[in-house]
Every structure is written in structure tokens, then in C-alpha cells.
């Protein structure tokens, strides 16, 4: 009976059995709640990591402001990489072949200034003509200045009196048989010192005495004969033309 009683030991009866059944249900409920909490925790961590990554990107775009400063700039969009190269159209190739150049923006729209070789030639021709005219004008001005300086130098040399001019006047006076004029010039300049006033009076006076020691022994008749000849006059005219070309 004892063995049968042990084998057939009845379980808890009544409230104790109900409590054990209730304890099993509570354990399963607690385990489900724990699993739910773990799932929500994983979702929260993933969301926080996503937000942290986004904030880091925004911070790289906005910059790194120091604490206490307000952000006053707008975020900029990251540049998009262009994977496809722009292929020029037929019109653009024709413009490039014709010598037209242009500038293009990011959208491929060309804003070009058309400058060909013909335009360059047209612009260079007036510039070269202007430079040539300036050079010619400067050369003409320089030549005029040099001519004026030469004329002034010659004029200053002619206007100045020198002993050579006196000698020329004396020679011309002799050739034109102006003996008195010659004597006056000699007396005025006193360049030779040979003929004096007394000697000239002695030589040219009406009365010529034997006691007159005249160093310039001249015959007035020879002078008169010289004045009458045409050869002497021609020589005088040639001398005048050489000495006084004006």
C-alpha cells in the first residue's frame, strides 16, 4: 500500500494547484515583456545611431560652430558628380573649325565672343598706320628743329663782326677804286699800321713833295685806269657775289 501510495502521490489540490498554474502564466508573460523591451531598445539604438550620423553630416555642412554661437548660414547642397561627358553638337564643331571661340557654363550653354583672324587683321592695320604717322610727324619735327638751329647758327656767324670782314671791305673798296673809303677804313681799324694819315695825305694830296716818305707808293692814274676797264668791274662783281651772296 505504501508503494502504491507513493506512486499515486497526488499533486497539489485546490488553491495550491491554481497558484502553480498561475505562476507558469506569469513567467511566460514576464519573458514576453522582456523580449519586447529588448526589441524596442534595439530599435531605439538604431534610430539614435542614424540620427547621430545625420547630425555629423549636417555639422560638416554647417561647419563647427563654437559653443554659444548661433548658426547663421544656410546648409549647402553637396555637388553632384557628372558621370556623363558632354558631347559637342554639330554646330559647335562647325564654330570651332571656323575659328570662333566661346565660353561654356555648367549647363553647356555657350556665351562666346566671336573673334576671327580677319577681325584681328582689321584691328592691326589702323594701329600700324597710326604708329607710322606718329613716327613720320616726330621725324619731321626733329628735322625742322635741326634746320632752324643750323640757320640760327649761320645767321649768328654772319651778323657778328670780325677782322676778316674788315679785310673784305678793304679789298672791295680797292677793287671799286674807292681809295678814300679804303683810307678811312684803314685809319678807323688801324689794322696794318703802315699807312698813317700823313702818308695818305702825302700820297693822295694835290701837292706831292719830295720830302714825303710815303710807304704806300700808289699811282692814282692806275686807279682811274682800273676803274675804266670792264675786266676789273667783272672781277669786282664776282667778288661781291662770293662775299655777299644775298
Curated annotation (Swiss-Prot):
The segment annotated Disordered runs over 1-71
Does the keyword Phosphoprotein belong to this entry?
A: yes
- Compositionally biased region (Basic and acidic residues): 33-43
According to the UniProt record, list the residues that bear Phosphoserine: 128, 140, 143
Q: Which residues form the MDFI domain?
A: 74-246
Polar residues biased stretches: 44-63
Q: Where are the transmembrane segments?
A: none
Sorted alphabetically, which keywords does the UniProt record give? Answer: Cytoplasm, Disease variant, Host-virus interaction, Nucleus, Phosphoprotein, Secreted, Transcription, Transcription regulation
User: A Pfam family in this protein?
Assistant: MDFI
Cellular component GO terms, alphabetically? cytoplasm; extracellular region; nucleolus; nucleus; plasma membrane
| Gene Ontology MF annotations | cyclin binding; DNA-binding transcription factor binding; Tat protein binding
> What this chain does, per the record?
Required to control the activity of various transcription factors through their sequestration in the cytoplasm. Retains nuclear Zic proteins ZIC1, ZIC2 and ZIC3 in the cytoplasm and inhibits their transcriptional activation. Modulates the expression from cellular promoters. Binds to the axin complex, resulting in an increase in the level of free beta-catenin. Affects axin regulation of the WNT and JNK signaling pathways. Involved in the development of lymphatic vessel valves. (Microbial infection) Modulates the expression from viral promoters. Down-regulates Tat-dependent transcription of the human immunodeficiency virus type 1 (HIV-1) LTR by interacting with HIV-1 Tat and Rev and impairing their nuclear import, probably by rendering the NLS domains inaccessible to importin-beta. Also stimulates activation of human T-cell leukemia virus type I (HTLV-I) LTR.
Outline the subunit composition: Interacts with HAND1; the interaction sequesters HAND1 into the nucleolus and inhibits its activity. Interacts (via C-terminus) with ZIC2. Interacts (via C-terminus) with AXIN1, the histidine-rich region of CCNT1/cyclin-T and weakly with LEF1. Interacts with CCNT2. Interacts with GATA2. Interacts (via C-terminus) with Piezo channel composed of PIEZO1 or PIEZO2; the interaction prolongs Piezo channel inactivation.
State the associated disorder. Lymphatic malformation 12: A form of primary lymphedema, a disease characterized by swelling of body parts due to developmental anomalies and functional defects of the lymphatic system. Patients with lymphedema may suffer from recurrent local infections. LMPHM12 is an autosomal recessive, severe form often resulting in fetal or perinatal demise. It is characterized by dysfunction of core collecting lymphatic vessels, including the thoracic duct and cisterna chyli, non-immune hydrops fetalis, chylothorax, pleural effusions, and chylous ascites.
Q: What family is it from?
A: Belongs to the MDFI family.
Task: State the protein's name.
Answer: MyoD family inhibitor domain-containing protein
